[in-house]
């Protein structure tokens, strides 16, 4: 008699996967609400577009592969991919961008490798990076938070800008991006990088309206705190483990603090790194993807620390203002190596 030994995992629980994905979707509610509050209805429109695109793309591939469409869609992984991409792009980006990015993420970055559990890279971040490299202007055209914005688009205006590029009154993105100082606004990280390169002092930069927040950038600090709240809830629900978020945030904070102490005139303070951009979204919702992250506890600590270091390096010295997506994908590359050297010793065998 021949016994076939399959590779781990030895149990496959569709309900467990679906439940975890659902918990992550629920935990995203505070972050989504904060982005709606500070950046308007465009975020909701992008989420709807991405969700529909993700489900249709996944259903199409499953149909072509002659696999069960209904059973696979119920695991909610396609919805989560669409959601993570949608909240990562500017709220008034053209409709075709989120559709293109989502379809690429689901078909190329996920299903091409065999579907959920087989993809080596985070699909949402693959989609994001493809869009960022292909359409850098549109992908960096964030609106100023409502508290410093001159023109705040309503729901109808948001839909019209996303689908036609103009509001009902004829305004365009350049008009909507104006802040209270009459200057076209960018994100806190983008503003800091651009201003330092232009020769402005940190003292001057901190006077810009975008930094009018209590701790970091206006609006962005509350968005990050909202994602943090959702992440803490995920930890409480035991949907994710603490190793990756903690090591990521501690490493990012440590690098930012040391850099700021050594070069306060050219490098951002730690609170700007921690509460701007996609820091908390990345820490709790992206890096913790169980498929593309390390699978051992020591490996998770190393994986998170590496991502934190990469985010700081890209933000401080790279060509892109945020860097979370690139850091995630670069860290994904190292996962097989990390897992190999941190795998637990087999019982009864010596080390080495």
UniProtKB/Swiss-Prot annotation:
Alphabetical list of HAMAP family matching this protein: RsxD_RnfD
Residues where FMN phosphoryl threonine is found: 187
Its EC number(s): 7.-.-.-
Transmembrane parts of this sequence: 20-40, 42-62, 78-109, 123-143, 148-168, 214-234, 242-262, 267-287, 301-318
Protein origin, superkingdom: Bacteria
Quaternary structure annotation from Swiss-Prot or TrEMBL: The complex is composed of six subunits: RsxA, RsxB, RsxC, RsxD, RsxE and RsxG.
Organism: Shigella flexneri
Gene name of this polypeptide: rsxD
Family: Belongs to the NqrB/RnfD family.
Entry keywords, A to Z: Cell inner membrane, Cell membrane, Electron transport, Flavoprotein, FMN, Membrane, Phosphoprotein, Translocase, Transmembrane, Transmembrane helix, Transport
GO CC entries: plasma membrane
Xref: InterPro entries: NqrB/RnfD, RnfD_bac
Name assigned to this protein: Ion-translocating oxidoreductase complex subunit D
Cofactor(s), by name: FMN
The keyword Flavoprotein belongs to this UniProt entry's keyword annotation: yes
Biological processes, Gene Ontology terms: electron transport chain; transmembrane transport
Topology within the bilayer: Multi-pass membrane protein
């Amino acid at each position: 008699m021949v016994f076939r030994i399959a590779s781990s995992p030895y149990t496959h629980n569709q309900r467990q996967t679906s439940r975890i994905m659902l918990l992550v979707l629920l935990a995203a509610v505070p972050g989504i609400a904060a982005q709606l509050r500070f950046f308007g209805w465009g975020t909701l429109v992008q989420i709807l577009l991405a969700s529909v695109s993700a489900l249709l793309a996944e259903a199409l591939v499953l149909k072509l592969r002659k696999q069960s469409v209904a059973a696979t869609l119920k695991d909610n992984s396609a919805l989560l991919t669409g959601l993570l991409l949608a909240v990562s792009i500017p709220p008034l980006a053209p409709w075709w961008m989120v559709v293109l990015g989502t379809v690429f993420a689901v078909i190329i970055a996920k299903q091409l490798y065999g579907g959920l559990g087989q993809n080596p890279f985070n699909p949402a971040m693959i989609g994001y990076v493809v869009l960022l490299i292909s359409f850098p202007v549109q992908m960096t055209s964030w609106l100023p938070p409502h508290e410093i914005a001159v023109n705040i688009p309503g729901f109808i205006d948001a839909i019209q800008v996303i689908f036609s590029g103009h509001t009902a009154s004829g305004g365009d993105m350049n008009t909507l991006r104006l802040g209270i100082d009459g200057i076209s606004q960018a994100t806190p990280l983008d503003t800091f990088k651009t201003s330092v390169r232009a020769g402005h002092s940190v003292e001057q930069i901190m006077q810009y309206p975008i930094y009018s927040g209590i701790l970091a950038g206006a609006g962005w600090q509350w968005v990050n705190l909202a994602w943090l709240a959702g992440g803490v809830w995920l930890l409480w629900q035991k949907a994710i483990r603490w190793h990756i978020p903690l090591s990521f945030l501690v490493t990012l904070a440590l690098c930012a603090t040391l850099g700021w102490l050594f070069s306060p005139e050219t490098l951002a303070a730690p609170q700007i790194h921690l509460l701007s951009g996609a820091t908390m979204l990345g820490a709790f919702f992206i890096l913790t993807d169980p498929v593309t992250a390390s699978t051992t506890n020591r490996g998770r600590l190393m994986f998170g620390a590496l991502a934190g270091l990469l985010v700081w390096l890209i933000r401080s010295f790279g060509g892109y203002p945020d860097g979370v997506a690139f850091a995630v994908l670069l860290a994904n590359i190292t996962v097989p190596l990390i897992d190999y050297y941190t795998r637990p010793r087999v019982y009864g065998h010596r080390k080495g």
